[in-house]
Amino acid sequence: MESGDHLGNLFDDMVEEDNDEDSFEEPACEDSFDSQEASSKANEPQNDSFDEPIQSSVSKQSDDANGEDEINEEVIQEQKELDLNEEDFNLLTIEEVPLDVLTARIRRVFTEVTYRAEPAAIALFDVAHKIIFKSTMLDCKRNTVIDSIIEGLISIIVDERERDQGAEEAEHVLMIFIAKLAIKNKSMKCSDLLYKLILLVDRLYLHADSFVRCRIYRLIACLMEEANRYADVMREHGDDAFLSDEDPTESEVMIPSGVKNRWMGKLAKSLLDKSPEVRCKAVIALSLWDHDIECKTTCCDEVTVNDLLWKSVHDVDESVRVNAARRVHIANENDIDKCIDYVETSKDNRVKQAIIVRLASDVSLLSFSEKQRFRLVNLLNNSDSARVQDVIHQLLVESWMKVAGDEIISPSIFPFPDSDNNNIPKEFPSIILEYLDPLVDPTAVYVFMKFATVRFIQKSTVQQACGSLDVEKFMKDLLSMTIPDCERVGLMRRTTFRLIPKDNNDGNEDIRKIFSRIFISRCFVDVIFNFAKGRLDATHLRSRALTFFLPDVTTFVEHLEKFCDAYFHRNMSTDYTCKDLVLYNLLHLMNVATKYGDLHDDKMLYKHALKKILGNSSFVFSSETILTIVMICFDLCKIGDDVKQLCDWMCDTAKQLMLSHEEVLNLEEAMKNDKVLEQMYLRSATMLLATCKHEEVESPTASMSSLFKTIIPALLGNKNEELQQLGLELIGFATSIDFENCEPYLKLTTLLIQRGDEVLTSTGVNTLIKVIKSQGFPKTANAIFQGEEQTEDDCQDALAKVFEKALVSLQGMALVQSVQDCLSMLSYGRYAWSKLMCAIIMLVFQKSNECLPLVKIFASYCKKSIRSDFNKMNLLLGFCRAVGIISKTGEDDSNIKLLEMTELVCECISSVHTIDGDEVIPQKKRKTDNEEELYPEIVLANRMVGRANSHPSSWIIRHVFTAMATSLRLECVPMKIVDTLHELLVDTYTVVRFNSNKTTQIAFKRFLTHCEKVITLHERMNALKLGVDFKKVKKEVICADEDPKSVSSSSSLGRKRGRKRENSEEEEKIDADDSFELFQYVPKSTRTRIRPTVNVEEDQNIKTEIEDSDDLEDSFEL
């Protein structure tokens, strides 16, 4: 191995990502290591921006003449070119010069590196290395070459001048240059420069200036990175020597282990530095250690480097979090799970984006487990951030498709292609099915396949430069593929479309191939149809896609009937796993073909085929499939008469299905004798349920009413819980359209809710909510409890208790469904139901740690549904009731996130201004009986202040007032009402101050200060009410006896600041203290503070003067 092989290309892979994230400008470095040369160049104009990769010591002079500009450019170009034939840069003459000449030459080298940056560093590295190596060979007490380097580096580090980004980049180039020289010389048993650098770091890493600490940590990062690179190269050299039967030499450790451990401990402590810039540099340097090395923290706990980096991911500063996310070690599946967990739960979009970039760029597709792949792909659908979805789309899809294209040509489920004779395009979209099984999560794979298809079209078309997709060329390329190649990638065309395999050897394997081909065809068709939206040639593109990928509707219907007969027959011996998925995708493609087809009788033909499939009792379908088929049949109806005829047909078919295997012709008699099969019950009831669900069915027909009376009691009385659940759902939809005939079944619903089964309870709650939405709460309550209760109010109270008890008894996804149904009911009508809102709030924030989407559902409800003051007051009363219940438990025993709950409620009930054109219109407020405006923010604040006054030592006061100080907006509340609230807070603070702990006092005082800021804002707004042009006010003549400061502005605030207020006797005795620091033992009361008021007489004089002026504008009127 050559002596410089371990260095590689000097600066190719040195990219400092943290330069863009730093929020401060570091001081500029010294421009030269040679003081004499620096003094000689002091009179010349210099450019210190370091923006260009190669800098010149003479700045460009801008002249008007074109000839002078060309001359200047030629001079600058000559100065940029580095002459390596100079004597100072001649490697052959270094052996024959004394130490003082070597010192002058090394200064010249660093001067050129300073000005010319990376190109000079690459060209002069060997020269600098030989100079340093030669200086260490000389017999002298003081090595002036190394001392010059150290002195120049110190001048860079401790310099406090402000720097721009170019200067920081030049500083980084110098540090890398010095670190590479130190490691290179250490590898040749010459460690003087490295030890000097170690001493410099140990002397300055505890410096008081944060800028100095930042540069020291950057120097540590450069040294560690070069040492790691040398270790990697030597490790590879050792592997090569082992394979070639040579004796591998022992690799020498560049930086002693004791020094590395000492630096690691200091960097770990620096993660808690007060400066975010220092913490950023500490994270970057610490990430260069191995992920599993343990170090001791300030609490003497041993944690790994990766754990410290993950702690920095949760730092308070965003730049620190982003830098830590970019540099966490991803070494195994646990680290990948940790990254995905953070992306799924965090709200910091920049950090999530940085982690996804790491996962896409640094982790191969083959390193992810199947579960991890699906979790990442599901973020394309489930993520709330469009930026995160875009990063996954552009980076993750690109990375995974490249890896898949390098590994395979076609999925293994299809016939393996002949590698020597195939015309399959590289990175065809269907190859991702090898790593993402659509049977596991069809929706996630469908989304990924669509993005992969768009990427493939962009890469294969010629018009990608102009931003459009050439779909015609894409289909022509597919048409050029041979039939065997199409078979190998799962591509079906109109001529090769089939659903029944030719050789039915393995049933499940064949149905998987069919599903994959149909799935791929659906993705291609949907991508082309989405692309055609809004285009002038949309009809042409859709017709081309249908002609290319799908058969005509008549042939398609024949394929559908044959497929159902082959795989859904009752007497089938094999249970096929994915036949329902195949049928669902087939129905989707059939819907597309009939909607955008050319023939007018396609819909009638399609509906007739579906009715034939539904009426065939020998076919066995799942409930979801039956619902889908029935909905499609109603969607294909054109007029209302067709809907009624189809309803009668559905009812008649359901009766025939229940009597299909019995000799009895009377349905009621067959039900009474238990002659109807449960399977036929399920199918008939599902058909009837789907009929009631459709929006076109608004009223029942005679056959529907008759069937309701027959089938609902039979379903509720059946022992099968699935049939009971279906009966409850049917009651809800049937009662919505036929309340008179189905009213008695509501009592049975309440009885089934009280049985204790979670599924039946959740279904019963859903049924009652559907009836309440259609018929109203009083009518529903009377229908259930009219005979048991005396008055209508008692009936409504009884129904309310049923809901509240049922909601509290549920768990898991049944609870999620019921909460969502209850919130939809509350948003649908006006219900003063604070108890139900209290139960929902407590359940949402009590179950927030159980991976249930309750908080997301509740936040969406607050954002979209709570707009009127009535709904705000209902939410407020429910919250206050919940706070009262939570306060009865201890802080350690309570598992409710009170702070998050209060923040969400405060943000929801806070009033905001709405903008209509150029006017700002505040929201209208509901008035009480005393004709006073009601503000929910003030109601909430008064209730919480009253609780603080009655229970000042309660632990909830700290959380509630901390959230109110940051989330409760009072800007829209009139100043008079806020002033009253402020006086109440001042009176209550005395009670809180003497009866609560320090943190509670701080939280209460924060809200008090928040009110004071709002009052100050109102005062300023009142002062700006006068529509006066500021420029004209400045031109007014100032009286000689008037203070200039008091009339410099049109507002009364300037006069108020200029006039000093005399303190009262009580205020002179007490020192004012507005601090919120934790070391303050007892905060002083704000009771004695007197808010400065505006001088009314002076304001009146100014108003009179302004009214007398006719030429004043109203440009500042709010």
Swiss-Prot record:
Region: Disordered; residue ranges are: 1-69, 1044-1071, 1090-1118
Looking up InterPro entries in the UniProt record yields: ARM-type_fold (IPR016024)
Protein's UniProt name: Uncharacterized protein C30G12.6
- UniProt biased composition (Polar residues): 35-60
Task: List the biased-composition ranges (Acidic residues).
Answer: 13-34, 1107-1118
